[in-house]
Amino acid sequence: MSKQEKAISLSESAQVDQQSVQPLPNSRKVYVEGSRPDIRVPMREISLHDTPTDFGGEKNAPVLVYDTSGPYTDPNVVIDVRKGLGDVRSAWIDARGDTERLEGLSSNFGLQRLNDAELAKLRFAHVRNPRRAKAGANVSQMHYARQGIITAEMEYVAIRENMKLQEARAAGLLDQQHAGHSFGASIPKEITPEFVREEIARGRAIIPANINHTELEPMIIGRNFLVKINGNIGNSALGSSIEEEVAKLTWGIRWGSDTVMDLSTGKHIHETREWIIRNSPVPIGTVPIYQALEKVNGVAEDLTWELFRDTLIEQAEQGVDYFTIHAGVLLRYVPLTAKRVTGIVSRGGSIMAKWCLAHHKENFLYTHFDEICEIMKAYDVSFSLGDGLRPGSIADANDAAQFGELETLGELTKIAWKHDVQCMIEGPGHVPMQLIKENMDKQLECCDEAPFYTLGPLTTDIAPGYDHITSGIGAAMIGWFGCAMLCYVTPKEHLGLPNKDDVKTGIITYKIAAHAADLAKGHPGAQIRDNALSKARFEFRWEDQFNLGLDPDTARSFHDETLPKESAKVAHFCSMCGPKFCSMKITQEVREYAAKIETVDVTVEQGMREQSERFRQEGSQLYQKV
């Protein structure tokens, strides 16, 4: 970027990433309306070609798929990142009558940034005065659920999870689905708003939905719903800009990121976050201790509860939907990490461990946990209770430090629930395959089925550059066992900051893992897309194969590397086997031959029946006089 470009205000120059706003091939955005006109749930409809006459010649119903891309892939919406996305939820929040609009920001740091003239060129131009719960009110989705109230957000996610399942069944898109094995989950045949309410009231699911993030398209995280994935973005002291982080956001949600965590640790964290939230249709999570550490110039010992509290309020007023809080890193657990191969690998965990040792005091996040809950329920920020002592190598998996912290997270979950604050639990990490099930079982036991949210886990440590694969294996397994959300890992894990291509690779890898888990659990409708793609593959409908896939661009590119001509996209073979050895083509020929034989057999059988009837009519005598 030139000096002249830098001098121009970002609120004047910022542009949307053009790659992120193109509709996916042969797809269109559709909206399913709820009980009121302003509940419009987005889905992506993939149109399919007719089955060729060689295969029976029939119409193929379009396939609906879950869509996280927000308005960015709707050609009817004008996207301007300088203004942010349109309002989705304000009318719902206003109707509840339990919030108030503040006259200004109430965080000291937020006010400092707002009044700093030097930041004017970087600042999002349309900063709104925040909302907060009225005195004595609790505005969390869990609180409403426990009052028996089905909110607009709950109805929205029920429609979104259900994906017009009844229509899909009627269209024959779900004639086959294998029974799943859900390890004791309570997955219904159909997701209803009442089921959503019950799950949230029980604490088995959360809808991360800060009242200050009104651009949000609500989604749900819980073991009895579709497995979700999270993508991480964020700058560091070594690089990246606000524009790049917003581009990563829009790129990530295009490919299926259900939530996004902003893990910025570099310059202008506050301003970067404002741009991200105002342009995000998915929940945004943060680790507030990262920013708090920046405020004390990276000296963990200088952190205070007062500074951290102000950081929570600052971020809650911007609209952060969930906070990772490392309140389970207790002083007594720190020595348990001394003999580990990789010690404490969590940034948040190491920060709090260092503070505890420096002051020889208990973790202030733990001692002030009730006060944190008071802040959370005033804005409906969900907890993501951080696993600060997660294993950073398979050698350290399932040790006393990890499971000791998990037990504490279970205690904290119950405290959060007493405040009607939504809560999920973060998990490892690096765990070999044979130890993954124990992690899930122990989390369900300790945390009473609160949603589990894991980083992988990575199943081996030997593949730097391929940790999206080592972790995708573990993610599929733990998703099947009951994990509600999977935090993606990119090929750059342990090596560097991911770029756009790395983000896409990580997300597609984790979409595969999450979908495989949904199939294995037996989530209703999970097999619709598989069935449609398999049918397209057998019928050599190449374009439909590409378009039904998670990444149409890559599928088309790989096909065209060896068969670039357009005629190859209607050919009844591919480059793998060629025209004479294509198993699909041979199978079709076998079917045609069998159909002919069947016709002959029917004719013969009919003739035999006629002769048999004549034999009986003539007295059933073996010999007849001529």
UniProtKB/Swiss-Prot annotation:
Cofactor remark from the record: Binds 1 [4Fe-4S] cluster per subunit. The cluster is coordinated with 3 cysteines and an exchangeable S-adenosyl-L-methionine.
Gene3D superfamilies to which the protein is assigned, alphabetical: 6.10.250.620, Radical SAM ThiC family, central domain
Cofactor(s) named in the record: [4Fe-4S] cluster
Highest taxon, organism lineage: Bacteria
Record-stated family: Belongs to the ThiC family.
Residue numbers binding [4Fe-4S] cluster: 574, 577, 582
Gene Ontology molecular-function annotations: 4 iron, 4 sulfur cluster binding; carbon-carbon lyase activity; zinc ion binding
InterPro entries for this protein: ThiC, ThiC-associated_dom, ThiC/Bza_core_dom, ThiC/BzaA/B
One GO biological process term: thiamine biosynthetic process
Record-linked NCBIfam families: PRK09284.1 (NF006763), PRK13352.1 (NF009895), thiC (TIGR00190)
Pathway annotation from the record: Cofactor biosynthesis; thiamine diphosphate biosynthesis
UniProt function note: Catalyzes the synthesis of the hydroxymethylpyrimidine phosphate (HMP-P) moiety of thiamine from aminoimidazole ribotide (AIR) in a radical S-adenosyl-L-methionine (SAM)-dependent reaction.
Subunit structure, interactors included: Homodimer.
Reaction catalysed by this enzyme: 5-amino-1-(5-phospho-beta-D-ribosyl)imidazole + S-adenosyl-L-methionine = 4-amino-2-methyl-5-(phosphooxymethyl)pyrimidine + CO + 5'-deoxyadenosine + formate + L-methionine + 3 H(+)
Organism: Pseudomonas entomophila (strain L48)
Name of the protein described by the UniProt record: Phosphomethylpyrimidine synthase
